[in-house]
Amino acid sequence: VTGTRNETDIRHLPMTISIVNRQQIEKRYEPSLLPLLTEQVPGLFTTSRGIMGYGVSTGAAGGMSLRGIGGSPTAGLLVLIDGHPQYMGLMGHPIADAYQSMLAERVEVLRGPASVLYGSNAMGGVINIVTRKQQEEGVKNNMQVGYGSYNTLQTEFSNRVKKGCFSSVVTGSYNRTDGHRSDMEFEQYGGYAKLGYDLSTFWKVWEDIN
């Protein structure tokens, strides 16, 4: 999907694509997607601000790069959620802290230039986060909580609902740490919500906020 903008067998694509599925995501118990992607995707590197978190400024903030293209703040590496570009206002670069594991069904990473399809922000490649969906009727809830050294707390939850033609996904996270030295405190709130309605077998409408 990321390489052609329509559904295509990955074996028929002329570019290099890595896919990280839900099973791989769940095995890591990481609140952020980026450490997992760094391990699973060749050529993708991320740097954090400290013990956790990435920030959005230059200097102390972290960044993402793919095949050497990116930096701090991240430029030349496009991040999509369900195919929609993610920019931080006038800064024009993605917000690394917003990409949480609970919202992702799978992640597709196109490694290499993709500016013909996606514009100049995709010089290094494209990361497309495909969000989770509730396939069967009913309600599903998930929650993960972790606590460790330096008063570090990591929490995530998700709620997925499907009733008839209506479906919804809501995820949230709260992470904090005191850090291993003074002035290293970090606190982060995150959330994602998506509402959808099936008009027919082939037509669906949805709205989301991150």
Show where each model-derived region lies:
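Short, acidic, small-residue-rich periplasmic hinge/interaction motif at the N-terminus
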Residues: 1-26, 34
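Transmembrane beta-barrel wall of Gram-negative outer-membrane proteins
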Residues: 147-176, 181-210
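Transmembrane beta-strand segments of Gram-negative outer membrane beta-barrel proteins
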Residues: 105-106, 125, 131-147, 167-172
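Extracytoplasmic beta-strand/coil segments of soluble accessory domains associated
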Residues: 35-84, 105
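Short acidic/polar hinge/loop motifs at secondary-structure boundaries
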Residues: 84-111
